[in-house]
């Protein structure tokens, strides 16, 4: 497979000292195989452990690593937005920093670039607890009802985005709703989606925060605000 000319990769990290070095090392191994130019943007979202220290140590040894640090925790959406806005190359890929995806499968998304503007992974066999699966099903059903676009896995953190999308679609959701906002605004703007099945792996270290009640309630509040903002917005 030919290499893409340039690729930015970012991933949020919050208290991921057990995963962050392996995540960055994996990106360092894979990106030179798929892109002529590339950058890694680890977004340290106000971690209280050694996550930021580890990121900075690795960045000192590799000029392709461009860290973003939040002094205070901004939430998942805030971290995604920081990586989204910091990216500089023609293609932008984001995933989570907890090693629950096989980064080698980025090639599956690259193969579909001619078919869409956003290449969206969906988890073929989601390896999460039942409550997270239930939350995802209910959330996805509500999103489809409100915004009308059909996507199998709205919140799958394995997405590739073309620069023209990033230049037009501005994000503001600070919480877990950021993927929904990206897709809703992109759909409204007329951009095309393509979906690709990807492998989902069990978390082996660190602690998930997405199923906390406070996170869920914030996401639902932001969802209805977004619906109110864009339902009558012209393309």
Regions found by a protein language model. Name each.
Residues 16-31:
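Short, well-formed alpha-helical segments that are part of the catalytic scaffolds
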Residues 38-41, 52-86:
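Conserved donor nucleotide-binding strand/loop of the catalytic core
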Residues 68-86, 91, 103-176, 202-219, ...:
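Acceptor/aglycone-binding surface of glycosyltransferases and processive sugar-polymer synthases
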Residues 18-22, 49-58:
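Acidic helix N-cap motif at the loop->helix transition within catalytic regions
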Residues 171-174, 184-201:
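Catalytic donor-sugar/metal-binding loop of nucleotide-sugar-dependent glycosyltransferases
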Residues 6-8, 39, 181:
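Cell-envelope/extracellular polymer assembly enzymes that use nucleotide-activated donors
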Residues 44-53, 99:
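A conserved acidic beta->alpha catalytic loop
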